[in-house]
C-alpha cells in the first residue's frame, strides 16, 4: 500500500517490480498520511467507530497507524496520550482502538446476521456475536469536543439485549469479552490517575496490564433455547463466543 504523497509514476514502477518479482498483492487504495492530532483517537469511542466502519466499509480507516510516534508530534500536552492515530501508544500501551481489531479478529467469514450495532458469525465449532455501541455519532469521525465535555460523555449510550439462540444441540460454553469506557480502556484509566504528563515505570506497567478486555466464562446446559441477557454502557463493544461443551 502506498502513501498518498507518492506520485502515480513511482507507484506504477514499484508495483510492476513487486508483481514481477514477488508473490505479493499491492493494495490499490492509498494510505492517508496525516499529522493531524485528535484526542478522540485515544478514546473508547474508536471501538464502535472502527467496528462499524470495518463491517460496513462506510468510511476509510487508512488514517490509523500501528503506533504513536512521540518524536514526530508537535504541540502535545503530555507524553502518554497525544491524540495520534496509532492503535498502540508510544509506550506500548494498547488503546481501545487496538481491541476493536482484536474483537473483529475473532469473527469468522460466515456471516449469519448483520445490522447496525451487531454482527453474528459462525465457524465449524462456534458462534461469535459482536455487539457494539451504535448511534449517529459513529457515521463520521467525531472530534473530541463533540463527544466529551470536561472528561464526561456528552451523550450517554446504554442498551440492553435479550438474545435467544435456537438449534443449539449441546451444552454450551459462553465466553464474553468486554471493552468500554469503564472496562479495559487505557485512556480512561489514565484519566482516573489524574492525566499525568509522564508515567513512572510502575504506573506504565499497571496501565499496560490493566488495559485488557474483561473476560467471563459461563456454562449453559442443553436446552431448546439459549437465552443471553446482556447490556452495553457507554462507547464500547462486547463479544460473545458460544462453543459446544465437550
Question: How would you name each of these model-derived features?
Answer:
Residues 17-23, 53-61, 104-110, 164-168, ...:
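A structural motif corresponding to the C-terminal end of an alpha-helix
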Residues 1-35, 59-65:
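Aromatic- and acid-rich polysaccharide-binding/catalytic face
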Residues 34-147, 185:
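Aromatic/acidic polysaccharide-binding cleft in carbohydrate-active enzymes
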Residues 4-16, 42-54, 98, 146-150, ...:
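Well-ordered, non-membrane alpha-helical segments in soluble/globular domains
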Residues 132-246:
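C-terminal beta-sandwich/jelly-roll accessory domains of carbohydrate-active enzymes
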Residues 2, 24, 82, 101, ...:
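Hydrophobic transmembrane signal anchors and adjacent membrane-proximal interface regions, especially
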Amino acid at each position: 500500500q502506498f502513501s498518498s504523497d507518492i506520485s502515480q509514476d513511482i507507484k506504477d514502477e514499484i508495483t510492476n517490480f513487486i508483481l514481477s518479482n514477488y508473490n505479493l498483492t499491492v493494495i490499490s487504495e492509498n494510505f492517508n498520511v496525516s499529522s493531524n492530532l485528535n484526542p478522540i483517537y485515544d478514546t473508547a469511542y474508536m471501538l464502535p467507530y472502527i467496528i462499524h466502519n470495518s463491517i460496513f466499509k462506510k468510511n476509510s480507516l487508512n488514517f490509523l497507524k500501528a503506533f504513536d510516534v512521540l518524536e514526530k508530534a508537535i504541540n502535545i500536552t503530555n507524553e502518554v496520550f497525544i491524540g495520534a492515530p496509532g492503535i498502540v501508544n508510544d509506550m506500548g500501551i494498547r488503546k481501545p482502538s487496538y481491541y476493536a481489531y482484536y474483537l473483529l479478529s475473532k469473527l469468522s467469514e460466515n456471516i449469519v446476521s448483520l445490522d447496525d450495532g451487531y454482527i453474528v458469525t459462525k465457524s465449524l465449532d462456534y458462534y461469535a456475536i459482536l455487539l457494539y455501541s451504535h448511534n449517529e455519532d459513529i457515521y463520521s469521525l467525531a472530534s473530541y469536543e463533540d463527544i466529551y465535555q470536561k472528561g464526561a460523555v456528552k451523550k450517554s449510550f446504554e442498551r440492553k439485549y435479550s438474545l435467544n439462540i435456537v438449534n443449539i444441540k449441546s451444552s454450551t460454553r459462553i465466553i464474553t469479552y468486554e471493552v468500554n469506557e469503564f472496562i479495559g480502556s487505557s485512556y480512561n484509566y489514565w484519566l482516573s490517575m489524574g492525566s499525568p504528563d509522564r508515567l513512572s515505570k510502575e504506573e506504565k506497567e499497571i496501565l499496560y496490564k490493566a488495559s485488557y478486555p474483561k473476560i467471563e466464562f459461563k456454562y449453559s446446559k442443553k436446552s431448546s433455547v439459549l437465552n443471553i441477557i446482556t447490556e452495553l454502557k457507554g462507547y464500547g463493544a462486547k463479544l460473545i463466543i458460544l462453543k459446544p461443551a465437550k
